[in-house]
Amino acid sequence: VTIFGESAGGASIYSLLATPMAKSLFHKAISESTWINADNVTDLKNANGFSESAEVLGERAIAAALDLAQVTGPDILSKMRSLSAQEILDLEHGVALIVDGWLYDKAPIEIFEEGSHNNVPIITGYNDGEGLMFIRPDRAPATLSDQRSLRVQQLGNLGVDLVDFYVAEDEGQLFDTEVDYSSDSVFIRASRELALASALTGQQDTYLYVFARNSRDPSQRAAHFMEVPYVFGTLPERAPGEDKELSQLMNDYWVQFAKTGTPNGQGLPVWPRYDLEKQMHQVLDVPISQGATDRKAQLDEMDRYMRARYEAAKH
């Protein structure tokens, strides 16, 4: 059994890798552009510095829906059952993952760091311009000073050493730098965390990719989700032949991995294993290539920052 998903689906893969309840239920995993980080994990019973407890959030939502000062009283269940389907849908409150003592007895950042996750062959990766889907040019800071002020505000005292990585060198790079920050802090750090955790356990079949093909404009980076039509072979009929070839290659990689636990096979460009020393990844582009330690300095610093935020939030 091979499980795989993208974005929210990638977050599901991340979650299944982390929970002991899924042990032995699958044999391989592919995570595309996961985004679960320590700052969007909620604890069931306790506030964790990033958010209030899941129970408090739920109680507040129910109280608001029932127009109650607090959720108490013998008639609370009847009032809850009186809600219409639409009213229930309107209660939606996004929570990425809840540490509940059952599915997870600790935060995933600890599970992956100690190597106690479900250790199966894994492909994990990200697109080189994930943030292009979420950052608009007209919303980017107008000056270098504005961008630095924004970074300092976002990163705080714990992220002082990270600020310079995400302030442009000149005003022509302001937008691209915003895209970098959005990509790295959400998707790329989390995807890389899975590769590092897997390699740390000695899992030989650990593979990391960077998807870098923008079919609309090959001179631009690949935004969030752009790899999906390539994986499923659903590019438009008018797509260039080289894009269709890349799509077939990616489909072959995914299927080969599902069958054997490695994307490598006869007639396929060699995809190097990811290990802690070389940190090699496959660049899925036209043409296919390999890279090593993709922007290692800032991503290592991003990891340290996220860990520091997590530790500070526990106290």
Question: What kind of region is each of these model predictions?
Answer:
Residues 9-13:
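Catalytic nucleophile loop
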Residues 117-165, 241, 251, 284-315:
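C-terminal, loop-rich substrate-recognition/catalytic regions characterized by aromatic stacking residues
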Residues 1-7:
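Alpha/beta-hydrolase fold nucleophile elbow
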Residues 156-201, 207-212:
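Alpha/beta-hydrolase fold catalytic core
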Residues 7, 35, 84, 124-127, ...:
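Short, flexible loop/turn elements at secondary-structure junctions
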Residues 1, 66-79, 175, 206-210, ...:
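Surface-exposed patches in mature extracellular/periplasmic domains of secreted proteins
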Residues 14-18, 23, 28, 32-150, ...:
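Substrate-access "cap/lid" subdomains that shape
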Residues 189-315:
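Mobile gating loops/cap/lid regions near enzyme active sites that modulate substrate access
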